[in-house]
A protein has these predicted regions:
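Membrane-interface interhelical loops and short amphipathic "cap" helices
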Residues: 11-37, 68-76, 103-125, 176-196, ...
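Leucine-biased recognition of intrinsically disordered, low-complexity hydrophobic segments
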Residues: 7-8
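Membrane helical hairpin/interfacial module
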Residues: 46, 50-130, 134
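Low-complexity, proline/glycine-enriched hydrophobic segments characteristic of transmembrane helices
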Residues: 2, 346-392
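Basic polycationic patches enriched in arginine
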Residues: 4, 18-20, 303
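A cytosolic-side transmembrane-helix exit/cap motif
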Residues: 209-212, 337-345, 366-368
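Long, contiguous internal "core" modules enriched in hydrophobic/ aromatic residues
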Residues: 41-43, 62-72, 79, 132, ...
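Hydrophobic alpha-helical membrane-insertion segments
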Residues: 1-3, 295
Length: 392
């Protein structure tokens, strides 16, 4: 049943090769905002959403027993219990890979350590701690299901899952807030950015639950979890569409030259393909259509399927919807990063006067964009903004 995960080592090897050929700040081939940044934002959102979705599913529908009532053999556990365990394991892997992208983008071990140890406390520090803690809690929740731990009690798991949900919300919102705090990028100052990232993470969590139905047999708890995930995701996708329209309205209606340039990039520039094709077409329109179709079809089949012990919804269609959601989530982050990160410096409004970098920023390798004085005269007007995720 788990043979479908056999491609995972090849994916890990491929990502490792990409990291090996990428420079220390995540910038490759002259691009001013590297692939590592987008990968980190995507994987952190997927992992956070998956942990939250699996925890909520267990708290509301599965109620997996622990302690003396635990089933020693994982293969003999109920399908819903295996579904939750699989989503938790996959989410933990996504968070770990995202943390690896974060470390690779920083480039040096001392910069990584400074995120956790060096004062002062910043949003970047808090986000790094949240990602690390969520990864640890997700790993503990997954291992408790795969391993035989007879002394573990259900009440302890409920507390851990509640904590995991709180940390997942922090991680989901953190990425958008981090972009919002970067000076000189007006597009990211919109409150629609963290809202979009948080909604996208929630949609990804629902997608992982729906995709996980491919790997387990259908029972009452699985049907409830999958049906609820599909219904919630329909609402989340509609909210995403509203937030996306709000971000576009903010960009198109702004009088600021930098925001207008970002709007041009989203409409028909470098960010247009991931925004319109991946996010809007796949992640919003197509995913919504497939999920609504599954819900309508499943409503008529639910009673007969429950009597027969079959799955209430076509799992292949749900897996397709999940894949579309994940493609849209990646496209959203790629488009927002591309539209906001590479605007000319002269178009961006200085949010604060230049200051000497703090010890924490200096240790983490934070550097401000090159000044016009260094870039040289009038030629600096056409230079692109040198921004990485760790710029301030």
């Amino acid at each position: 049943m788990w043979n479908r995960f056999s491609l995972l080592p090849h994916v890990v090897i491929y990502i490792g090769e990409r990291l090996r050929h990428t420079s220390g700040n995540g910038i490759e081939g002259g691009a001013l905002f590297g692939e590592l940044v987008t990968a980190y934002l995507f994987l952190a959102g997927v992992g956070a959403g998956g942990v939250a979705a699996a925890s909520v599913a267990d708290l509301l529908f599965v109620h997996e027993p622990f302690g003396a009532d635990v089933v020693p053999d994982f293969a003999e556990k109920r399908p819903a219990e295996r579904l939750v365990a699989g989503v938790l394991a996959l989410s933990c892997g996504a968070l770990a890979l995202g943390a690896g992208c974060l470390a690779a983008d920083l480039g040096r071990a001392d910069r990584v350590l400074s995120l956790f140890l060096a004062p002062p406390v910043t949003l970047m520090n808090l986000g790094a701690w949240a990602v690390a803690l969520l990864t640890a809690v997700a790993a503990a929740l997954a291992l408790a299901r795969f391993l035989y731990v007879p002394w573990l009690r259900r009440c302890a798991m409920v507390v851990a899952e509640t904590i995991a949900c709180g940390l997942a919300v922090v991680v989901a919102v953190y990425a958008g807030l981090l972009l919002q705090t970067l000076s000189g990028v007006r597009l990211w100052s919109s409150p629609w950015v963290p809202a979009l990232f948080a909604l996208s993470a929630a949609s990804c969590g629902c997608a992982l639950l729906m995709a996980g139905a491919l790997f387990v047999e259908g029972d009452g708890s699985v049907r409830k979890a999958v049906r609820s995930a599909a219904r919630v995701d329909v609402v989340v996708i509609v909210a995403e569409a509203v937030a996306a329209a709000g971000l576009l309205a903010f960009a198109l209606g702004s009088d600021h030259a930098g925001v207008r340039a970002s709007a041009t990039s989203l409409m028909h520039g470098p960010a247009a393909l991931p925004w319109w094709a991946a996010f809007v077409a796949c992640g919003l329109a197509a995913a919504l259509a497939v999920e609504v179709g599954c819900l309508v079809r499943g409503h008529g089949r639910s009673r007969s399927a429950a009597k027969a012990g079959a799955k209430a919804y076509p799992t292949a269609a749900l897996a397709l919807a999940a894949a579309l959601v994940l493609v849209g989530a990646l496209g959203l982050r790629a488009a927002v990063v591309e539209a906001g990160a590479q605007r000319p410096l002269e178009l961006q409004e200085a949010e604060a006067p230049a200051s000497v970098p703090s010890e924490n920023e200096e240790a983490a390798g934070l550097r401000s964009a090159p000044s016009a004085e260094k870039s040289g005269g009038e030629g600096s007007a056409t230079e692109r903004e040198d921004v990485t995720l760790w710029s301030n």
